[in-house]
Amino acid sequence: MLTILTILTSFIFSQNDCTDGRYIEEIFNVDVQYGIEYGENINQNILGSDFTQTLFMDIYSPENDDFEDRPLIFFMYGGSFISGSKSSPDIVALCTKYAQRGYVAVAIDYRLSPVLIFNANEEVAYKAVLKAMHDVKAAIRYFRMMDESSPGTYKIDSNRIFTGGVSAGAIAAVNAGYLDQYEEIPAFLLDDYDELGGIEGLSGNIGFDSSFHGIV
């Protein structure tokens, strides 16, 4: 069952020994892997023309940490779905703080919808949220794919995956968590879902599980 967590550590405490300060205190230096490709999909530029966008993420990990099963948390930036970046200062700060506490924190790029600047109707807005939802699901699937094909690469626990974000990113994270069954999709959104790839989307790593366990 999906949970909205205001204090993530309350969930983690029940899973692990935290007597060394892990998950509470900033006890680690941070290693960052920049520009890891996790997928690609069709997007539109500001004029509405299609192009293929490659999707990247930055992975923040506790440095010199030998723990094998670390919680994984994704942060999505804000910007009204028309601007923003995984290198936004607030996202960098969040990822750094969580990695210092022992999490693997990930800042993802997701497809923006600059066409909203000139055409902010409901259909375009719904599609903007849906594209971001599909992209974070692809990023989650990437880690499960790597966990299966190259165990220990990122030292994550695939049973403790969380999402969160700022502003538009928070909206995308919540929707990715709660619109996860086809029968739950409002009738007026069905055509958009079908056009863009259904619940899972087409952003990459299809066939792996995209579920997660809480929203921060």
Predicted segments, located by residue:
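Bacterial Sec-dependent N-terminal signal peptides
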Residues: M1-D20
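N-terminal cap/lid segment of alpha/beta-hydrolase-fold proteins
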Residues: Q15-E68
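Short beta-strand element of the alpha/beta-hydrolase
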Residues: E68-G79
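Cap/lid segment of the alpha/beta-hydrolase catalytic domain
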Residues: S80-D90, D109-L130
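Primarily recognizes the serine-hydrolase "nucleophile elbow" in alpha/beta-hydrolase
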Residues: A138-V216
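Short amphipathic alpha-helix adjacent to the substrate-entry channel of hydrolases
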Residues: S87-A107
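Extracellular/periplasmic catalytic domains that process cell-envelope and extracellular macromolecules
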Residues: I27-N29, S49-T52, D66-E68, Y98-Q100, ...
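Amphipathic alpha-helical segments in well-structured domains
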Residues: I91-C95, V129, M133-V136
